[in-house]
Amino acid sequence: MMFATAFAATTTSSSSVQTSWGTINEPSLPVASAVCKAVPATQKPVNGLLDASVDADPTTSAPDTTAIQSAIDHCPVGEAVKLVVGSHGESGLLTGPITLKSGVTLWIDKGVTVFASRNPADYDSGLGLCGIANTNSKDSCYPLISGNHLVNSGIVGEGVIDGRGGSVLTTGDNAGSKTWWDVAYQTKLSSKVTQHNPRLLDVNGGSNFTLYGVTFQNSPNFHLVFDGLDGITAWGIKILTPSLAYTQPGYACAEGTTPDTVNGTYATCFTPETVKNTDGFDPGESSHVLMAYSYISTGDDHVAVKAGSGSGSQHLMFAHNHLYYGHGLSIGSETNTGVSDMTVEDLVVDGHDSSESVGIRIKSDATRGGLVSGVTYQGVCVRNVRQPLVFDAFYSAAKTKTKYPSFRNITVTGFHDMGSAAYGGGEAIFAAYAKYPLQIALNNVQFDGAQPKASMKGHDGSPSVLPANTTFTFGPGTVSFAQELEQQHGGGVTFVDSVTQSPAPVDCSNAFVKYSSVSANSPI
């Protein structure tokens, strides 16, 4: 087994990943004879942006929708619609919401970018709320791309889907005055406000859905959402928000240009911390899920495995992935129908010292908690992360406690944190209910230099001192901060010390790669 090795996002030779449910081979692009229709690009973007004049008139906000949707609707099962560069070098298509078809693949060719409309009316579900933030919590925006009960469908290719989250809206209350991300940032200013922004991709029900090689960027809201699928393969994809088109290199935005500092007008520069609720990959109530050889940098959870209804989520594998800005490879917060049999293998996290950076995380609370069990993390390299390890049953304060979280049989083996200039060893959170203690095994978990702060005050209704209500099993390999855990902790904590070895930390010497080395659109 190979741990903490840098991989290209899409390999050129055939490769495979071994999962608990079998061997999953790298997907492949459709053969030329399987293309039912090629749809040429019509737009000429410059530096990742369409000229504002292209869709300043709301009546021309989505000129390519009909061509793309018609091609999908008329494509036979087992074939693909291919979006290609135009005859005069055009590389962009501009569309509103489109619906995928069961058995049909959308192929976005290399050099092609699908741009989303910035007209909220194109997405509005009939409530007239899309593109604003208010106290109404009802879903009001259709996603850019959607599908229901899809079987053997997918999105493949080396092209890009761009949600244009940093572009100024053209209709509604915020026309000419806010971008999608300005709207989203209002939820940061008031907990009572809901943003009404579209997701990039939302698939409900079905089986055997494939994402291969595609870049998803600048979503106004969550990027990739799945609910109730059996069989999802995401291989060699990239999720990037904000892209270089909406920021400066290194996210070095000037004061007064970002949503948190702008005064009286829309923001013109964005950072991961100011593009709220832009989750990367969210499989909910789904089984047989694989994400491999992929790259994610965003403003919220890199991954959020959820189980809020149905039969829960089980049989998940995350292998050979690179994470950058974001809130971690997470489970939760909805776990009430259960998450089980999940493996994270060969994970690399570089949090860039963001104040919101997280490594691996299981989160829930007593309003939406359930059993999370059989979760293994192995071969993890981390640096520049504020919270490298989070196992928190008190993710938010629960007024009505009816669904308690229970985290059992959690294993972390081969975890190496190389430290942070801003946060040293960062924070390690272990918090559970007395009736449902956290059961976690740590083996060869090592921090260079400063050790993580594990003893801390409680939060959101947790016990007053953490760690609390946790059974730790150490070994057989060294746990570098075990002594601190044993000396300072809250109530309900027990230790089983089975350390018999002093192995070298996981080798992270070649693990970290700049996102810009695999994507020219990346600012980092």
Task: Name these PLM-found stretches.
Residues 196, 248-250, 274-277, 304-305, ...:
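Active-site-adjacent structural elements in folded domains
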Residues 354-524:
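Extracellular beta-rich repeat passengers
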Residues 97, 144, 200, 223, ...:
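Structural detector of coil-to-beta-strand junctions
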Residues 110-111, 151-160, 207-217, 230-244, ...:
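Right-handed parallel beta-helix
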Residues 68-74, 91-102, 117, 155, ...:
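Short, T/G/N/S-enriched strand-turn elements that build extracellular solenoid repeat scaffolds
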Residues 1-97, 101-102, 110-205, 212, ...:
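Extracellular "leader-to-stem" segments immediately downstream of a signal peptide or signal-anchor
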Residues 166, 229, 286, 301, ...:
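Active-site beta-loop-alpha junctions enriched in small/polar residues
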